[in-house]
């Protein structure tokens, strides 16, 4: 434990990997942790044969979600519920035209809200977050919130506070010593309180859906899960329960809001730091889309620079640098090492996204990392911000689409204006734990003529 820098655990893992190699064991208290570092080892352990014996490590702060849902579920229901949720998400437009139109509709409301700032400084944390939150709310609840709705803003505040809380040093300690620290004051108490409040809100929505459910005409993903529950209500072994559905929907609501929101916000800060990159994006948008047509996914083919910038933002910030910690569900052997059941396994994504041969000067923000010599977008097999294998992010397709369409729409209509000289903008994260937390900032958005 004392070899870890709690404010930047991924940095500690990198330092230890340089000393001990790509696979090493450390003990946090009595807990055995195996860190897997570097592209070769990570690709072996996630999509490879070992991926089949990896479960999700239970997170003490999310004890209320224990063995339910799809994020921190390590129980027997996880595989089937995840598979059904993914299929239903695809049916509701995941990566297809259905979600494209959802995002385009929401982009209209986001642009209107940005215009109302009238060029004055504002904190983008919740305003920018409204768009991805409404997109996932429509998929889950067939509901759209007004940007000034108090409950809407409260939910986004809880999502944001939990993402930051999970990344603070105290939570890193609590995750490894929950029995010792549970009764002490600390940020773990706030996270658990927030989890309970989010779950209560989602539970109310699920109950409302159940009361008005038409099994022949499901309105959204929540209805689809409830239909499955009704199908097996006479079964001895039930996969779907009201509480399980609530946790699954809450997982998707949190993940579908906060990750995309934080990435967009961090992206705006980076673009203000590098106005020459923003200018190149304006030129590409003007040439391909023009001033009035709403951006579409088909534009990606003609906008390699925007496509590269969106990917480079994700690579550079490495939103979840140490991945979601996994756990060996049975004894296994990896690279000749015996890994006992219950061992925590950490496949580090930052070691892949910051690979210095694939991405020269990886600590620098360079869209050229993903552009080839002819100026076309260059896909990299090292681009793994959504993880890999059976636990890959369920919303990867939706997130990719949101980032491209929303960022394109913002830059189509606005110039970003920082409150300080670009060279004085600090784009270093304020905390790196579960997630990579960007600094708070204000900006102005100036309508383009």
From Swiss-Prot:
Required co-factors: heme
Pfam families: p450 (PF00067)
Pathway entry: Lipid metabolism; fatty acid metabolism
Induction (free text): By ethanol.
Chief subcellular location: endoplasmic reticulum
Location in or out of the cell: Endoplasmic reticulum membrane; Microsome membrane; Mitochondrion inner membrane
Keyword list, A-Z: Endoplasmic reticulum, Fatty acid metabolism, Heme, Iron, Lipid metabolism, Membrane, Metal-binding, Microsome, Mitochondrion, Mitochondrion inner membrane, Monooxygenase, NADP, Oxidoreductase
EC number of this enzyme: 1.14.14.1, 1.14.13.n7
Catalytic activity line of the entry: an organic molecule + reduced [NADPH--hemoprotein reductase] + O2 = an alcohol + oxidized [NADPH--hemoprotein reductase] + H2O + H(+); (5Z,8Z,11Z)-eicosatrienoate + reduced [NADPH--hemoprotein reductase] + O2 = 19-hydroxy-(5Z,8Z,11Z)-eicosatrienoate + oxidized [NADPH--hemoprotein reductase] + H2O + H(+); (5Z,8Z,11Z,14Z,17Z)-eicosapentaenoate + reduced [NADPH--hemoprotein reductase] + O2 = 19-hydroxy-(5Z,8Z,11Z,14Z,17Z)-eicosapentaenoate + oxidized [NADPH--hemoprotein reductase] + H2O + H(+); (4Z,7Z,10Z,13Z,16Z,19Z)-docosahexaenoate + reduced [NADPH--hemoprotein reductase] + O2 = 21-hydroxy-(4Z,7Z,10Z,13Z,16Z,19Z)-docosahexaenoate + oxidized [NADPH--hemoprotein reductase] + H2O + H(+)
UniProt GO MF annotations: arachidonate epoxygenase activity; heme binding; Hsp70 protein binding; Hsp90 protein binding; iron ion binding; oxidoreductase activity, acting on paired donors, with incorporation or reduction of molecular oxygen, reduced flavin or flavoprotein as one donor, and incorporation of one atom of oxygen
Binding residues for heme: 393
Membrane topology: Peripheral membrane protein
Group of enzyme by EC: oxidoreductase
Positions that bind substrate: 254-259
Top-rank taxon: Eukaryota
Gene Ontology biological-process entries: epoxygenase P450 pathway; xenobiotic metabolic process
InterPro entries attached to this UniProt entry: Cyt_P450, Cyt_P450_CS, Cyt_P450_E_grp-I, Cyt_P450_E_grp-I_CYP2E-like, Cyt_P450_sf, Cytochrome_P450_fam2
Activity regulation note: The omega-1 hydroxylase activity is stimulated by cytochrome b5.
Sequence similarity: Belongs to the cytochrome P450 family.
Subunit structure: Interacts with chaperones HSP70 and HSP90; this interaction is required for initial targeting to mitochondria.
Function: A cytochrome P450 monooxygenase involved in the metabolism of fatty acids. Mechanistically, uses molecular oxygen inserting one oxygen atom into a substrate, and reducing the second into a water molecule, with two electrons provided by NADPH via cytochrome P450 reductase (NADPH--hemoprotein reductase). Catalyzes the hydroxylation of carbon-hydrogen bonds. Hydroxylates fatty acids specifically at the omega-1 position displaying the highest catalytic activity for saturated fatty acids. May be involved in the oxidative metabolism of xenobiotics.
Protein name per its UniProtKB record: Cytochrome P450 2E1
Lineage summary: Eukaryota, Metazoa, Chordata, Craniata, Vertebrata
